[in-house]
Amino acid sequence: PAVAVQAAAPGSSGSAARAMTVVASSPPAAASTTPVPAGAPTAVEVALAQQGDPYRWAASGPDSFDCSGLIMFAYKAAGVSLPHSSRALRGMTERISVDELQPGDLVFGGSPVHHVGMYIGNGQMVHAPHSGDVVRVASVYSTSKPVSFGRL
């Protein structure tokens, strides 16, 4: 099934409002035997709604986030409790390939892992990049190398 989400940047209005629609459909016959969590569409919607919120180390919302704090906050809204650590998140996911990615899957960067974002479809993720930046959408390959992917 397709997931369609619209989110406007916080504090924006009128012609200055930034809105984004993401439509992602399931790829055919993924090799992973683990289904995407039932709360994934809600988590994607919540994460996208945080666009424009500032990055702050160790923050988990509601008005600022670090990378794992954004994931934790979004999945908490979907009824899923997760740790506030990109490495801990990596350790609890099933490794999947880029071809298996579904909205709600996690994108990890670094070796050892030190960054995480949430896949939203079409090769894009929503993430809280680093100090001085804001929650935003970017390519899954815009994070620290190497990049790996996981399913909760």
Question: How should each PLM-predicted stretch be described?
Answer:
Residues 51, 57, 68, 116, ...:
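Short glycine-rich loop/turn motifs that provide flexible caps or phosphate-binding loops at active sites
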Residues 1-54, 143-152:
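Intrinsically disordered, low-complexity
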Residues 80-134, 139:
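...with weaker cross-activation on analogous glycine-rich loops/strands in unrelated enzymes
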Residues 36-39, 63, 99, 109:
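Residue-level signature of the cytosolic catalytic core of signaling kinases
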Residues 32-36, 60-64, 139:
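Alpha-helix initiation/capping motif
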Residues 50-103:
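Catalytic cysteine-centered active-site loop
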